[in-house]
């Protein structure tokens, strides 16, 4: 089984994600739901999960959400006491008395900021603070019946892109094509198709240190050593790893392959 996994790096702008290829199972991450339908949508951040759920995408299409713990008959009113009104994001309550409650407060954000700043004192303080305070708030999502959301059992605390690749392998893919996995550089502008839009960092944000993403990818390549991974890249991509089951291809060559 072939899987095509879309990351949200800007290199994939040359690729038409709305095209459907019968020989591939498609996987996408986060805001790609705004542009197209994929066979499997992976969403890690709770603000984006709420966006996807409110759009009703999750009622027609298979989704994989992180930490999607459903509470039955739960009253979240007492939790609102720790948040200002502008930081409470609650969807309309439905007849089905089930919800998912997620979020972080300012204290959590400040703790993360202090921890990272102490470890990497040379980082841009303003940029780091924006990253740490992203999505501060209480997110209460009231559920409807017959959605197609599945809670992600494993992996946990990974990025959406690497989680999608791992899930594709779990579901039996023996060939995985990775598009838009451009990694990042903390000294360069952020590389993301959706930067500057709702639930994403501003256009002028800096990138991330990719060390965790690379580690997660290498874990996948080693665990699923019998799977053939094809990293679809642009001309200036520099590989961060060397594994015998990882190959590289330009977008134009993948397009030719898909025409066959």
Report each predicted region and the residues it spans.
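Metal-ion/cofactor- or nucleotide/acyl-coenzyme-handling active-site neighborhoods
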Residues: 1-260
């Amino acid at each position: 089984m072939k899987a095509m996994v879309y990351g949200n790096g800007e290199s994939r702008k040359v690729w038409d994600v709305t095209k459907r290829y019968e020989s591939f199972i498609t996987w996408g991450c986060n805001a790609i739901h705004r542009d197209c339908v994929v066979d499997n949508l992976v969403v890690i951040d709770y603000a984006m999960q709420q966006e996807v759920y409110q759009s009703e995408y999750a009622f027609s299409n298979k989704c994989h959400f992180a930490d999607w713990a459903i509470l039955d008959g739960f009253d979240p009113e007492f939790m609102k006491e720790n948040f200002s009104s502008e930081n409470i994001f609650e969807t309309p309550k439905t007849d089905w008395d089930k919800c998912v409650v997620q979020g972080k407060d300012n204290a959590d954000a400040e703790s993360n900021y202090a921890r990272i700043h102490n470890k990497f004192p040379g980082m841009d303080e303003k940029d780091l603070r924006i990253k740490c305070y992203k999505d501060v708030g209480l997110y209460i999502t009231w559920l409807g019946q017959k959605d197609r959301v599945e809670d992600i059992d494993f992996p946990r605390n990974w990025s959406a892109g690497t989680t999608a690749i791992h899930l594709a392998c779990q579901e039996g893919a023996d060939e995985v094509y990775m598009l838009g996995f451009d990694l990042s550089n903390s000294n360069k502008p952020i590389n993301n198709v959706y930067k500057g839009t709702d639930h994403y960092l501003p256009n002028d944000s800096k990138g991330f240190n990719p060390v965790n993403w690379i580690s997660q990818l290498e874990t996948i390549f080693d665990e699923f050593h019998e799977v053939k991974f094809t990293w679809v890249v642009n001309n200036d991509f520099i590989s961060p790893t060397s594994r015998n089951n990882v190959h590289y291809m330009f977008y134009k060559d993948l397009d030719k392959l898909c025409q066959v």
